[in-house]
C-alpha cells in the first residue's frame, strides 16, 4: 500500500478536505453526520411523522432517496429535456409508511425538489454538503451489496458470478466522487471499464470528437483508480498497458478480466466505512448530541457506539424472520457483505448466516405489495465487540472457500487466515499468457501460485471491547477454519434491478 503521505485518508475524501489532522478530520466528519441528522429531523417534522415512524428504516430510505434525487443534476437536466408521461421533473417523492388504527398504511408523497434542496442546505449551514450526500449513497450501496447478488451483471461483462467478493459498490452512482471510488471493489471498477470498452467496440464514434475526448479522460481516470487499488507492481504495470491503449478493445477486455481474477488472491485495497441510515443520525442529534464538537469517525468505534444506543424499526413481511432482517441491516451498516462470516459472527456476538439461509427479502417494500399483513419489529443492530474497518485487501491463505463465492474481501482489521479455494481460482488461469502483457501475466500467476500461507493471512489488530475506545487491548479471536466462511455461498439471493 502506498504510504499515507501520498493518499488522503477516507475521511478527507469523505469531506473533500485538504490535509487535516486527526481532530480536524473527526470534526469535519462529525459536521457531515450532524447535517444529515438535522435534515432528517426537519423532514420528519414536515411529514408529521411520529417518533416510531421516524425510526422506521423504510421511511429513512425514502427520505434519503428524495434528497439524492433532488441533487442529481445530470438526471434532473435529462428529465427536463426528455419529458416522460406522468413524471414531473421538478418533483420527487416515494412511499411513507404510517401507523393508522393499529395497521401500517402506505402513503405516496410528492415534494418540490427545490424545497428538499432548501431543507438540506438549511440543515447544512447553507452548503450543498456533497459529502453528506455521498455518505447516504454509500449506505444505499452497502445495503444493496448485502441484499443482492450481482450475478447477471458479472456474467454480462464476462466475469464469473463466484467473483462477487470483488463487487463492492457496484450500484454506486458515478457522481459519488473520491469517497465513492475508495469503496469500490476491483470487480466494480473492471465492470465499469469493460462497459466502456464494449461501447467503444460497438459504436465507432465513442472515442471520437469532443465527446470522445471527455470519454477518454474518464476512461483513463477510472484506470488510475483501479491501478491504485492493486498492491503488486505487475498488476499495476498491466493497468498502465490498459490505460495507454490507443483503441481499447478485446485485448484490454482480456487483460481486465485476468486482473479481476488475480484480485481473488492478490487482493486490492478497498475501503470500508460504516455508513448508517439517516434515521440513526436524526434521533441522536435530537437528543442533543453534537457530532461536530464530539468528533466522529466512520472507521472506528463511533458507529458501533451509535448503534448500541439506537432504536431502529423495520417493516416485516408475513413470512420473514426479524432476526434475519436485523442481520442484513447490520451487515449493511458495517459494509460487511463480503467479510468472512466467522469474523462478523465474532464481532456481532451472534451467528451470522449465509445469504441463502436468510428468511428475509430486501428492506424496501415494492409499491404493489399488500400492506394488510405487514408487521414491524425492532432491528437488533448492536454488537459484542468493535473492530477497525480496513482499507487493505490483506492477503490470502489456502483455505477452502465455497461453491457460491470463492474469496472474501476483509472489512474488519482482524488477524485471520483468509478463505479462498486456490484450485478453483487457479483453474481460471489456464491458457492465455501470450500477447503484449505476457510477462506481467506470467509474473502474476507465479505470485499467485507461490503465495505462502503466512504471506497471505490478514495481519490485522484484533477486536476490542466496547468499553475500550482507545483500542488499547486487542483480542485476537481464533476461528474454526473448517466452517464455511462466505456469505453468498450456494446462494439464491435476488438479483439487483435498478
Curated annotation (Swiss-Prot):
Name of the protein: Nucleoprotein
Assembly and oligomerization: Homomultimerizes to form the nucleocapsid. May bind host exportin-1/XPO1. Binds to viral genomic RNA. Protein-RNA contacts are mediated by a combination of electrostatic interactions between positively charged residues and the phosphate backbone and planar interactions between aromatic side chains and bases.
PTM annotation, UniProt: Late in virus-infected cells, may be cleaved from a 56-kDa protein to a 53-kDa protein by a cellular caspase. This cleavage might be a marker for the onset of apoptosis in infected cells or have a specific function in virus host interaction.
Annotated InterPro entries: Flu_NP (IPR002141)
Short sequence motif named Bipartite nuclear localization signal, residue ranges: 198-216
Comp. bias regions, Basic and acidic residues: 8-21
Transmembrane segments: none
Major location (coarse): virion
GO cellular component, one term: ribonucleoprotein complex
GO molecular function terms noted in the UniProt entry: RNA binding; structural molecule activity
Motif (Unconventional nuclear localization signal): 1-18
One Pfam family named in its UniProt record: Flu_NP
